[in-house]
Amino acid sequence: MILILLFLTAITVITVRLYRKVLRFPPGPFPLPLIGNAHQIAYQAWRRGGILPALDYYRKKYGNAYTLWLGPKASVSITDFETSQEVFVKQGKKCYNRQLAPILEHVTGGVGLLIANGENWAEMRRFTLLTFRQMGVGTNIMEKRIMDELNGRCLEIDAQIARNDRAIVDVKFFDLTVGSVINSFLIGKRFEDEEEFLKIKKLFDESSETFNIFDLNVPVWFLKTFLPSRFKLTWDSRHQIMDHVMKGVEERIRDIESGAYKIDPKKPNDVVDAFLSKMKKEEEIAGGQHPYYNLKSLKLVLHDLWLAGQGTTATTLYVGFMKLVNHPGIIQNIQKELLDITENGARDLTLKDRPNTPYLNATIAEIQRHASILNVNFWRINHETIHFNDYQVDPGTMIAAQVGVLHVNEELFDNPKDFNVEKYLKNPKLLQQVIPFGIGKRSCVGEQIAKSELYLVFGNILLRYNVKKHGSTPTNEDVYPYSSAKLPDVSGKLEFVKL
């Protein structure tokens, strides 16, 4: 009897303490001790066919800021632009660290750009932004890199058209184009060998299966013990990718040591040049290995930049064209706009043309809204109290702008399931509320490169070719709807015909 009373007393105390904690946060379903809202999230995801519809269900029920408890941890999701701006920009200094997924931190050691915090992350971000500036990101130099790759791929398309009056294009065209651009920035080489690229792309796609709320939050020991195959998939795929990107680094180091290659520290050809130069300088100052500028950090920085720079942009291009071929009127409007400003196609579209292409800009924004690559965004951890909308978020809370939910928020975008370009022309402020690259201090470091790729590739392909669907187009439904990363059906094909 005494044991029962003690047990009931303990449960009562835990529940009362939990209730008091819950009251301080934005509204949400009431959590259970230990498991939080895990059972409710799983049920809603199953019932609604994915994690994104489940999170959108909670938005509709509780508002644009709501709380879900992942076990004993509170997570606050923000799903509108104004509040995201308030929390992650105006109060961004209070929450720049990420909640690191145990399995990914185990794989990376907390090093790099994506799965890192503190001074390590800050130093690598500063280095990357400085290196991009030195390499001409935002200038004609970057534009030339992108256009050289696109022109090379289009020569292959033109050869097909010359033989067959049309070219059949699938997702590989976009994957290889974007993959070669990012590879040229990272290690100065385009992908000449298609099989080499497809191998590394397959590894990234496989690792997406375990990129979900469950795998990213349970302890490593749990995965190793009870789900060893899932642990192995994440571990093996990430390390094989890292081993792949390091092959070029090892080759570069051998060439430097033999005198066959020299680095100009003021004008690096790629990220590897810049990093090796900085590493040498820091080692000379420190008299030994630097804690941040070492080969392990280089490996993780290359991995993170490749992951962030290839899959997201290539997927957006593929999804975008699959949307456009079902809206031929939009393609015609874009082509008319482009022909008008390029003297009837006498020259390529350039980044300087952006202010004069409002229809293309609006179309790209709508494509990015629909493509939304992440179903669940990385949570951050606030180290100071955050106040917004009469709520108080205590230090140590997980908090995120859930961009995927924001992009289907009918309060911001009328009829969000529809593909509608006109709304941005009627209300240009909506362009700012499409935030596929995130918001605040942890926004995508390669945002400028990705935006330039999207504009130049979409624009110049539509300036050169009539694009139509070849057979039926996939629905663009998520292949892994319970994953944190969206992976669309990529079985669709396109027909390119010369204008």
From Swiss-Prot:
Q: Which residues bind heme?
A: 444
GO molecular function terms noted in the UniProt entry? heme binding; iron ion binding; oxidoreductase activity, acting on paired donors, with incorporation or reduction of molecular oxygen, reduced flavin or flavoprotein as one donor, and incorporation of one atom of oxygen
Q: Name one GO biological process term.
A: organic acid metabolic process
Enzyme Commission numbers on file: 1.14.-.-
The protein's matches in InterPro entries, at most eight in alphabetical order, are given as: Cyt_P450 (IPR001128), Cyt_P450_CS (IPR017972), Cyt_P450_E_grp-I (IPR002401), Cyt_P450_sf (IPR036396), Cytochrome_P450_fam2 (IPR050182)
Tissue pattern of expression reads: Expressed in hypodermis, intestine and vulva upon thiabendazole (TBZ) exposure.
Task: Please tell me one Gene Ontology term that the record gives under cellular component.
Answer: intracellular membrane-bounded organelle
Induction record? Up-regulated in hypodermis, intestine and vulva following exposure to specific xenobiotics, such as thiabendazole (TBZ). Expression is up-regulated over 2000-fold by TBZ.
Q: Name one Pfam family in it.
A: p450
Query: When the coding gene is removed by deletion, what phenotypic consequences does the entry describe?
Result: RNAi-mediated knockdown causes a reduction in the quantity of a hydroxylated thiabendazole (TBZ) metabolite and probably its glucose conjugate.
Record keywords:
Iron, Metal-binding, Monooxygenase, Oxidoreductase
Give the protein's cofactors: heme
Task: List the CDD domains.
Answer: CYP1_2-like
**Protein purpose:** Cytochromes P450 are a group of heme-thiolate monooxygenases. They oxidize a variety of structurally unrelated compounds, including steroids, fatty acids, and xenobiotics. Involved in the oxidative metabolism of thiabendazole (TBZ). Catalyzes the conversion of TBZ to its hydroxylated form.
Q: What else is known?
A: Thiabendazole (TBZ) is used as a broad-spectrum anthelmintic to treat parasitic nematode infections in humans and veterinary animals.
Query: Per its UniProt record, what PANTHER family does this chain match?
Result: CYTOCHROME P450 508A4-RELATED, CYTOCHROME P450 FAMILY
Regarding protein family, the annotation reads: Belongs to the cytochrome P450 family.
Name assigned to this protein: Probable cytochrome P450 cyp-35D1
This protein's encoding gene: cyp-35d1
